[in-house]
């Protein structure tokens, strides 16, 4: 355990030394850099999620390693029935849920029911709804799990950031 702690400390110190006093920039301004723990297999496009062209470097990218991660799929039973997913983005994340005449934003629904991901499907019974989620988080920006896999392949932090963000720093 002590040897592993020493190795981890050495890796952290090296990463800190390589990145200290560096920031990611876009158009001479600090870049908005969201991240999530785990995607559904691809990240989301900022234009679809945020409805703006302000972050053109946040494009959807494949995260194949996320599909096989330990917590890739989870399920949760919630109260009520009659929920319908009415809108999803191109990566499969929920943008809108309807129950009767009520329409709710997909992320608001996620937060309301404390779901681990914004990518989900539903299965309904007489009195309950089972929500099956894929990934952990909102799916926008960098996937921590995929970044870790790229690092294990020997990719530098710069190559990892370029893969997800396509910004210069």
Give the label of every model feature segment.
Residues 1-169:
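Conserved, single-site charged/polar hotspot
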């Amino acid at each position: 355990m002590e040897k592993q702690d020493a190795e981890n400390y050495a890796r952290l110190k090296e990463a800190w030394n390589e990145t200290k006093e560096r920031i990611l920039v876009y158009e001479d301004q600090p870049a908005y850099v969201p991240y999530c723990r785990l995607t559904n297999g691809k990240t989301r496009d900022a234009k679809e999620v945020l409805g703006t062209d302000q972050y053109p470097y946040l494009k959807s990218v494949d995260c194949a390693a996320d599909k096989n991660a330990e917590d890739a799929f989870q399920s949760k039973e919630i109260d009520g029935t009659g929920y319908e997913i009415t809108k999803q983005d191109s990566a499969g994340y929920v943008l809108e849920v309807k129950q009767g005449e009520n329409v709710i934003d997909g992320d608001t629904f996620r937060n309301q029911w404390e779901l681990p991901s914004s990518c989900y499907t539903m299965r309904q019974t007489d009195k309950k709804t089972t929500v099956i989620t894929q990934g952990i988080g909102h799916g926008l920006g960098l996937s921590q799990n995929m970044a870790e896999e790229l690092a294990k392949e020997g990719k530098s932090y710069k190559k990892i950031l370029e893969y997800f963000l396509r910004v210069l720093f």
